[in-house]
Design a protein with these regions (language model features):
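Post-transcriptional modification and biogenesis factors for structured RNAs
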Residues: 1-192
Length: 192
């Protein structure tokens, strides 16, 4: 299971949308305090809709609390080179607009954690400089500061899931009123 970590999120609509994405992908959501809202806000529930009770939610007092509760993580302190794996330990990736490597440069493991910072400032620079080799970014045109947080989470999360074969996610869907045409006649690969 991929884990999404939000460091001090500020906007409830973003957190609600991210929570819904986590439910849709079978990913866990870890939130590091303080928040810029109350977790039971109507706005979060509205953005997360009826999925909020299904969120695999974990909360932490601060980043140190998060690290102490996850000693199994490879946080990137031991530099082994760009995009290399560190044995079998799940990695903690840090999404930032400042990183040298992109999210597509690295190999995500099936149990990795991907951390995103608050909307106004990102992940604190003290954390980024300590873990530079695990920092990743989404390429953007230079005229914009950053993408929306929930969009950034979705982009990187789905790349991590793609690299792991979309494990445990449905590969096809049913139409509401009609049926799909015969896949054999269309020369499409069979779906599971």
């Amino acid at each position: 299971m991929i884990h999404i970590v939000l460091h001090e999120p500020e906007i409830p609509f973003n957190t609600g949308a991210i929570a819904r994405t986590c439910v849709a992908t079978g990913s866990a959501l870890h939130i590091i305090k303080p928040y810029g809202f109350v977790i039971s806000d109507k706005m979060i529930r509205r953005a997360g809709m009826d999925y909020w009770p299904k969120v695999d939610l974990h909360e932490y007092v601060d980043f140190a609390d998060f690290l102490s509760q996850h000693p199994e993580l490879d946080t990137g302190r031991a530099l082994t080179g760009r995009g290399e794996t560190h044995g079998t330990k799940p990695k903690l990736w840090y999404a930032t607009t400042k990183a040298h490597q992109t999210y597509s440069d690295v190999t995500f493991g099936p149990d990795d954690y991907i951390m995103f910072g608050k909307e106004s400032a990102g992940i604190p620079e003290e954390i980024l400089t300590e873990h530079e080799e695990n920092c990743i970014r989404i390429p953007m045109w230079g005229e914009i500061r950053s993408l929306n947080l929930s969009n950034s989470v979705a982009i990187i999360l789905y790349e991590a899931l793609r690299q792991n074969g979309f494990e445990a996610l449905s590969q096809t869907g049913d139409l509401h009123r009609l049926h799909w045409r015969d896949e054999a006649a269309l020369h499409l690969p069979k779906r599971d």
